[in-house]
C-alpha cells in the first residue's frame, strides 16, 4: 500500500496545529509514530475509534467534525496500485496460499475493505485486531502459530518495505523481501 503521509500531515496540521499534531499523533520528523502516541495505541487496538477521534477533537485548534478527522486520517491511505493487486492475484491463481499481515487500525481497515477485494488472501492479520504491531516479535509469533494451527507450513515468504520488520520476521525463519518484485522473482 502506498502512504500519503504529506496529505495526512497537512490535514492534521490544519486541525491541530503543527506542534500539537506532532505530540498527539506522535510523529517524529520522518513521519513515523512513537510507541506511546495516540496513533500507535490506535494501531495496536489499545483504544477505540471513538477514543482516537475524541483524543484528536480535544486538542483541535479550531472547530472540527468527526467526519473531517476521519477524512484526514484516511488521507494517509494512498491506495494500492492496480499492477500490485494483479501480481498478488496472479500468485493466488498459480496456487500460492496468500496471507496478509498489516499494521493497521479500525478506520483504515474498514476503508481498505470498502475499496479492495481481500478474498485473494486466505487469512488477513491486522495489528489492531491482534493488539500488537510490527516489529514486535510477538505479532510474528502469533501469526506463525495461527497459520501452523490452520495447517499452513512454513517457511513463510514475507514482503515488507521496512527493514526492521523483515529482520524480526527472519528471526522466526520467514523468508523476507523488500518488494513484491523480489518475491515474484523466486516464485
What positions do the PLM features span?
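A metal-dependent, Asp-based hydrolase signature
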Residues: 36-70
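Active-site neighborhood of HAD-like aspartate-dependent phosphohydrolases
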Residues: 1-31, 167, 171, 185
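Asp-based, Mg2+/Mn2+-dependent phosphohydrolase catalytic module
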Residues: 92, 105-187
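Hydrophobic alpha-helical core bundles mediating ligand binding, dimerization, or RNAP-core interactions
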Residues: 8-12, 53-56, 73, 108-112
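Short, surface-exposed acidic
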Residues: 14-30, 61-72, 152-155
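Substrate-recognition element of Asp-dependent hydrolases with the DxDx(T/V) motif
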Residues: 65-113
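N-terminal alpha-helical segment
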Residues: 5, 33-35, 49, 105
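Soluble or luminal CAZymes and related metallo-dependent hydrolases
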Residues: 48, 76-83, 135, 139
